[in-house]
């Protein structure tokens, strides 16, 4: 097997497993603590440290991957995720609302750091392995296809994680579910560390963090738009919808199943995007962005 293909498969499997635990954790935290009496507003606050830690980590993740190697950053992400899950498993609402909330915020922050370490390193690996392959299609087209499939499959796996989280919480309860996910993280950590080259993705010349910010105004505008797009989605999808459904009498599995279906569906759309947008239209895709946005 081509070494680039092998590395791509390893990174993808790593990210799939991590994303499964990330999706499962979201639904487990939300439903468990709502059942324990936390208000919807407090639950929303629990995700603040997760998101803010992720934003900060995302800024430096690419720089760290380049300077220290993708393999190391993937490993660090998995270790931090297992630490966050382990710490969260000991939380007890008998500690009092303030102490329990602060502890959960700390654990969620760890998981947010882990998510963006793993995400940034994985996407860097996809670009690296894509650049090494040769074929009939252009480099840009190949990268577009690989990233689309990778991102789509990631979101599909997150949807499976939502459903898995509901099932785990129903069958095993809060603490045991978290420990099962730690065990899964340990397994994929061992696999990743034994399969990827030691210096995978490490560059000889060190680059400054500033160099990773795009000088292209269009890219920066898209990044800004993406923040508001995700914010508009998360307002209703992350907390409001599942809390409303659960308070309306839905079970853990029913709530997580609906969220899973929705996430898997849009992951599928992402994965087939290269089929929807022909290679000949890639260079002019920016001009069609306004029409796509109006359609959405």
Protein language model regions, located:
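Helix-loop boundary and gating motifs at the non-cytosolic
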Residues: 2-53, 218-262
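Central cavity-lining transmembrane alpha-helices of secondary-active solute carriers
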Residues: 45-63, 260-273
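Helix-to-loop junctions at the C-terminal end of transmembrane segments
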Residues: 57-70, 169, 269-287
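Cytoplasmic helix-loop-helix junction between adjacent transmembrane helices
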Residues: 107-154
